[in-house]
């Protein structure tokens, strides 16, 4: 019998990711009349709970992300605090991040993933990004959201074949630009756009360059901008001529070469203007290559790739079943009252590092 840890109205089960500033748990929430829901609960680590700047960023993440309701973006349910410990409750995705999938597929077969599948995944990400980029406030004014950290760790694929963008932690709405000190680099170096490196004002095209890097790496099975140091990596992004993906993987068709290189144009004016433009080209390629790749195909691929992991996850979930069965029968016997402090909860949690499907952003 495994016992979860009470935390406010939630029961924390396995810790599914931990970074330098926050940790993410699989958690369960209960309501009246048998209502219950699994969530991913992202909580600031106790040692930085007093860091006002990070707390502001954490709150900004929730405020931006809660405005977004789209099939290809992880849904935020709640921002709150328990005993001064801030947390965000969000949609729980049973699946893997793109980095883990990429590494597993490469180890399994040693060959790059099918270009059709990659085009399908990137097209779904384009849909989510386009929605975020075009989001307007209640008065109908564009909010100007730029994700700023589009990378394989921030893209999840569920075992059902759903593709989701996570972690708007470094996203900034343009009307909040006063919060951003000019020239501060945020995001992962190897996935930054040239204008991001230079500390220039960003628009949606910066995210498309970052997505272009992800696209290229999936197509070739190799990292694109990896230098001997962070400085070298940034120099590569600014100066390196990028050969077409087909030069590294002959399976990549010409149409995909063109889409990939257009997203990676150093000059923003030569890049796709909107994610919807890139999506249109990807869809045209997919529809002209029958049989069309579907969500079911993606689900099948993922379930095959992570068959053993899925079985282990089922066992972990089953270990909590007796506790939750008892709780459902007799809720009064489980009054949470003395919620353990966030530090105690952290120390007592089993740390499951079997996957990192909810990323830590700046952690």
Can you annotate each of these PLM segments?
Residues 95, 100, 149, 344, ...:
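Positively charged, low-complexity intrinsically disordered regions
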Residues 153-156, 190-338, 342-356:
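C-terminal lobe helix-coil module of Hanks-type protein kinase domains
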């Amino acid at each position: 019998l495994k016992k979860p840890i009470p935390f406010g109205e939630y029961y924390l089960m396995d810790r599914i990711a931990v970074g330098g500033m926050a940790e993410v748990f699989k958690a369960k929430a209960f309501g009246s009349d048998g209502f219950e829901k699994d969530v991913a609960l992202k909580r600031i680590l106790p040692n930085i709970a007093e860091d006002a700047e990070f707390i502001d960023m954490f709150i900004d993440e929730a405020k931006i992300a809660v405005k977004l309701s789209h099939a290809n973006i992880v849904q935020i349910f709640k921002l709150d605090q328990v005993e001064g410990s801030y947390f965000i409750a969000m949609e729980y995705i049973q699946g893997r991040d793109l980095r883990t999938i990429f590494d597993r597929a490469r180890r399994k077969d040693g060959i790059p993933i099918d270009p059709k599948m990659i085009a399908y995944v990137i097209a779904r990400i384009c849909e989510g990004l386009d929605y975020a980029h075009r989001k307007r406030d209640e008065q109908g004014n564009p909010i100007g959201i730029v994700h700023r950290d589009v990378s394989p760790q921030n893209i999840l694929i569920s075992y059902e074949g759903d593709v989701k963008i996570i972690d708007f932690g470094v996203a900034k709405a343009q009307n909040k630009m006063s919060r951003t000190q000019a020239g501060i680099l945020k995001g992962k170096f190897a996935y930054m756009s040239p204008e991001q490196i230079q500390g220039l004002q960003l628009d949606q095209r910066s995210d498309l360059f970052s997505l272009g890097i992800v696209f290229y790496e999936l197509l070739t099975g190799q990292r694109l901008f990896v230098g001997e140091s962070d400085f070298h990596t940034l120099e590569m992004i600014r100066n390196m001529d990028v050969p077409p993906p087909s030069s590294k993987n002959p399976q990549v068709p010409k149409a995909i070469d063109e889409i990939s290189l257009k997203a990676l144009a150093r000059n923003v004016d030569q890049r796709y203007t909107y994610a919807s433009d890139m999506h249109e080209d990807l869809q045209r390629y997919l529809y002209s290559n029958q049989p069309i790749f579907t969500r079911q195909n993606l689900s099948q691929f993922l379930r095959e790739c992570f068959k053993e992991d899925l079985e282990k996850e089922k066992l972990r979930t089953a270990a909590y079943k007796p506790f939750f069965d008892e709780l459902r029968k007799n809720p009064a016997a489980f009054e949470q009252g003395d919620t353990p402090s966030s530090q105690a909860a952290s120390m007592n949690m089993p740390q499951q590092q079997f996957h990192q499907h909810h990323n830590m952003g700046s952690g």
